[in-house]
Design a protein with these regions (language model features):
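Conserved SAM/AdoMet-binding glycine-rich loop
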Residues: 1-61, 66-68
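Radical SAM enzyme core and accessory elements
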Residues: 103-193
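Generic recognition of well-ordered alpha-helical segments
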Residues: 49-52, 81-82, 96
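A structural motif corresponding to the C-terminal end of an alpha-helix
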Residues: 49-60, 86, 136-151
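Soluble or luminal CAZymes and related metallo-dependent hydrolases
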Residues: 6, 45, 71-75, 132-136
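Catalytic cores of alpha/beta
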Residues: 9-13, 69-85
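Flexible glycine/acidic-rich beta-alpha junction loops that bind and position SAM and/or redox cofactors
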Residues: 32, 36-37, 66-74, 89-120, ...
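Proline-aspartate-enriched helix->loop->beta-strand connector
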Residues: 19, 88-89
Length: 193
């Protein structure tokens, strides 16, 4: 779900249809980074969508991708601060943008010589902006450790898989990120790194 064009009326219709939570494909919390990702929404749209969900007590998650083109320590800080302001039920944060062949991003990176060759893109290949390449994963881990509602897929994935299997075994249903804040799992998972 995109935060752009989200409305209270849309949320009401989703609730009436049985929706139990929303995962926004937010990607970033900086207008500069959102433009680089060619997103059709702004930071103000993210704030508004979050406020609508909070006003109704509706569980929501913002999924983020740190390290995209043009990412800087300033935009990383803006994204973290926006998540603190928006107070989502959970934040799913990843480092690095998966680059697929034959996409505008792949073509731009190939033209600049930042990808070893198109063949490299047929396997999982992730781009991290040079300005944040050193230290980005640790900065995101620090943000997660300081908050109880952040999940970091790919950083200790086996522990998360075992935890989520146990939660499912206890009968928990739906988006498991909904339980992260309530059970303080995000901080525990980040600390296990």
């Amino acid at each position: 779900m995109t935060p752009g064009n989200f409305s209270a009326e849309l949320l009401d219709a989703m609730i009436a249809a049985g929706c139990q939570s929303i995962d926004f494909g937010t990607d970033a919390g900086s207008d500069r980074t959102l433009r680089a990702f060619r997103k059709s929404f702004t930071v103000d749209d993210i704030r508004a969508a979050s406020a609508i969900c909070r006003a109704r007590g509706f569980p929501f998650c913002h999924s983020l991708v740190f390290g995209g083109e043009g990412e800087s320590w300033e935009t990383v800080a803006e994204t973290i601060a926006l998540m603190d302001e928006c107070r989502p039920t959970a934040v799913t944060a990843m480092c690095g943008v998966r680059v697929y062949p034959e996409t505008p991003m792949a073509q731009a990176l190939l033209a600049r010589g930042e990808v070893p060759g198109v063949e490299a893109l047929y396997e999982p290949w992730f781009y991290v902006a040079p300005g944040v390449r050193d230290g980005l994963a640790e900065r995101v881990r620090e943000a997660a450790r300081a908050r109880g509602n952040w999940l970091l897929p790919g950083m200790k994935v086996n522990d998360e898989e075992r935890l989520f299997a146990r939660l499912r075994g206890r009968g928990l249903k739906g988006d498991l990120w909904r339980y992260v804040s309530r059970l303080r799992l995000g901080r525990a998972l980040a600390a296990a790194e």
